[in-house]
Amino acid sequence: PELGRYCADWPVAPRIVALAPARQVLLSSAHVPAGQQRYVKQALPFLIEEKLAEDIEDVHIAMGPVAREQPVPVAVVRHLEIIAWLDALYTAGLPPASLIPEPLALPWREGQISVAIAGDCCLIRAGQWRGLGCDRDNVLTALSTLARQCQDDGGAAPAIAIYCPEEEEPAAWGRCLQQQHAAADYAGEVAVHEREGGPLAVLGPQLVGEAPADRIDLLQGGYGSDRSAGARRFNWR
């Protein structure tokens, strides 16, 4: 609420970008049959239903750009989750212009896996549209699995970039991962980036300015915003 009141005093309303918790969002993709791109919105629920643990009626599906002969990137979240987030944001006086899954706010480049150590939860981005959240006890295993998957898909061994605050002993994380790589005869490089501040020190820079092409905004469909005349009225209620 305090932040909402602070923003209300600005002469120009700020553009608010909210982050959706990684563990509550499934980032996946769907292969659309040739010639069916125009019907992709209608087809998506049927194309990804087998990947879900929930009933398709209980989830919201947001999609990324549709490219010819390419899988369609999607983000899936339970309706109950996104409604709770929007309720909290509006109650605090912070109507969001965008709602982005946390992993897609990590810095990333081709041939790299990025991971941010943030307390008990770690964020991983393993591709333009791939990412997840996991607990810190499983992050090294998850990184090794994702790196091997990249190689199995025909790519080179990806470099791994670790973003870690000083109190998390970044050098120790780097050594553990390098030892694991050596034991598995893995050739990918490991780079450790010590950062100050919380997770937003890593995620924040990617959220500034216009939304790049490698984000999926969850505010689509029934959760989309009416931005006409500067309005931020959401239709999800």
Each language-model region and where it sits:
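Hydrophobic/aromatic-enriched cytosolic interaction surfaces used to assemble or bind macromolecules
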Residues: 1-237
